[in-house]
Amino acid sequence: MRNIRLRVEYDGTPYAGWQRQPGGIVTVQGELEACLSRILQERVNLAAAGRTDRGVHALGQVVNFQTASSLELQRIAHSLNCLLPDTIRVDCPQEVDMEFHARFSAAERQYRYFLMEEPSAVFGRFAGCSSRPLDLPLMHSLAVTLKGIHDFSAFSREDRDGTGSLCSVRMAGWYRHRGFLVFHIAANRFLRSMVRGLVGAMMDIGAGRLDPCSFKAMLDADAHARRVRPAAASGLFLSRVVYPDDYGCRKLR
């Protein structure tokens, strides 16, 4: 058996999220597994670093699967890209140790949220939009306070996997890039809809709809803190997944 790792990029707009679902619902995992099974002539089960929600995109999703096939790595990637819809692409095929797992071996995940200050017919598919002017320095000052270990339950949807609501954030901040306001955050793990919840809260404060003190109350998991409406899924990208050095990959072949 071989353990194969791939990097995946996708436009999440037409999909009901990453995770495979019954009843013919179209998901990114479902599309990838169907194409891989066809290429390798065996059933394939993918593990992924992040289970993105409906409409969320990825530039650096990482997956792995085990196979008995001896098909060369570049052939697998090329065949996948020929069969997959235009909204999904794979690259960086690597053979890794059998104990590597895309989700459980990851040390850090990074997300970026792209936000427009004016509506766009072209970029609206890949960015959120604010209906009011935003105080970017204030939003950045709030983002900086996320660094460290916090309970993010106030910013997320119900946790169903039993792993708790504490996350360790290495960095977070806002910046301007080519006409977009961009929120960048790196952490060991993320709760469901957590990044969109954080962005939604900071947008409300940056637009003057919420007092900045309410952000600290939410971060302190105050039972009386207001839960915010999450930002639109269209602006969120899983941008990178980081693994420890001891999961070095063999050369492509």
From Swiss-Prot:
InterPro entries, alphabetized: PsdUridine_synth_cat_dom_sf, PsdUridine_synth_TruA, PsdUridine_synth_TruA_a/b_dom, PsdUridine_synth_TruA_C, TruA/RsuA/RluB/E/F_N
Top EC class, one word: isomerase
Enzyme nomenclature, EC number: 5.4.99.12
Molecular-function GO term, any one: tRNA pseudouridine(38-40) synthase activity
Matches recorded under Pfam families: PseudoU_synth_1
Catalytic residues, chain numbering: 53 (nucleophile)
UniProt cross-references to Gene3D superfamilies, sorted A to Z: Pseudouridine synthase I, catalytic domain, C-terminal subdomain, Pseudouridine synthase I, catalytic domain, N-terminal subdomain
One biological process term in Gene Ontology: tRNA pseudouridine synthesis
Catalysed reaction equations from the record: uridine(38/39/40) in tRNA = pseudouridine(38/39/40) in tRNA
Keyword annotations: Isomerase, tRNA processing
The keyword NAD belongs to this UniProt entry's keyword annotation: no
Binding-site residues, substrate: 111
Keyword Cell division: no
Cited CDD domains: PseudoU_synth_EcTruA (cd02570)
Domain of life: Bacteria
Function: Formation of pseudouridine at positions 38, 39 and 40 in the anticodon stem and loop of transfer RNAs.
Family from the record: Belongs to the tRNA pseudouridine synthase TruA family.
Oligomeric form and interacting partners: Homodimer.
Xref: HAMAP family: TruA
Name the UniProt record assigns to this protein: tRNA pseudouridine synthase A
Upper lineage: Bacteria, Pseudomonadati, Chlorobiota, Chlorobiia, Chlorobiales
